[in-house]
Amino acid sequence: MSPNPSSTGPVIAPAPKGILDPATGRPIGANDPYFLEVRHELSDKGFFVATADDLITWARTGSLMWMTFGLACCAVEMMQVSMPRYDVERFGFAPRASPRQSDVMIVAGTLTNKMAPALRKVYDQMPEPRYVISMGSCANGGGYYHYSYSVVRGCDRIVPIDIYVPGCPPTAEALLYGVLLLQKKIRRTGTIER
């Protein structure tokens, strides 16, 4: 944006529009009942009252720690989400190396029969509440290798899945949208009982 020589005030960048929801064309969260209720209470009274469970749920959505379970080419697309162009950490979604420190596991790629026990073991090491994002056609249902004798036809046969991200491979935008949907799901339902 070029400065206007006739004005004496500072140059101000336009307000960020956020990531648009492809279904509505509006920024994600614009019609979220949670945010609408908070906005209404703040405009009405200047403060809002919440239960401790609501506060914990709100805090949990902004501090999700994720770990990768990258098995194939989808893991390369998953790496892009942490890079400066998408920067998933601005949404409170930070990577961790250990399952004991992680809230979310992203399964990306073809899950084979030999790798299935390792997936379950890593999932069991994660603390409660724990969430799983299945990324890509291979993780969702076997994908291109669906009819192979050595492939699990969807990682939901091994661990419970909260969000499915379709595509072969899905783009970084699709994974980012899946992360935002997971945060919305946690806000809406609180702790997901297993």
From Swiss-Prot:
One annotated Gene Ontology cellular component of this protein: respiratory chain complex I
Compartments, as annotated in UniProt: Cell inner membrane
GO molecular function list: 4 iron, 4 sulfur cluster binding; iron ion binding; NADH dehydrogenase (ubiquinone) activity; NADH:ubiquinone reductase (non-electrogenic) activity; quinone binding
PROSITE patterns, per database record: COMPLEX1_20K
Domain of life: Bacteria
Bilayer topology annotation: Peripheral membrane protein
Cofactor: binding comment: Binds 1 [4Fe-4S] cluster.
Bilayer-crossing regions: none
Main location group: membrane
Catalytic reactions on record: a quinone + NADH + 5 H(+)(in) = a quinol + NAD(+) + 4 H(+)(out)
GO biological process, one term: aerobic respiration
Keywords annotated in UniProt: 4Fe-4S, Cell inner membrane, Cell membrane, Iron, Iron-sulfur, Membrane, Metal-binding, NAD, Quinone, Translocase, Transport, Ubiquinone
Needed co-factor(s): [4Fe-4S] cluster
Stretches assigned to coiled coil: none
Signal peptide: none
Binding annotation for [4Fe-4S] cluster: 73-74, 138, 168
EC number assigned by the record: 7.1.1.-
Family under the similarity heading: Belongs to the complex I 20 kDa subunit family.
Function summary: NDH-1 shuttles electrons from NADH, via FMN and iron-sulfur (Fe-S) centers, to quinones in the respiratory chain. The immediate electron acceptor for the enzyme in this species is believed to be ubiquinone. Couples the redox reaction to proton translocation (for every two electrons transferred, four hydrogen ions are translocated across the cytoplasmic membrane), and thus conserves the redox energy in a proton gradient.
Protein name: NADH-quinone oxidoreductase subunit B
Source organism per UniProt: Bradyrhizobium sp. (strain BTAi1 / ATCC BAA-1182)
Gene symbol of the encoding locus: nuoB
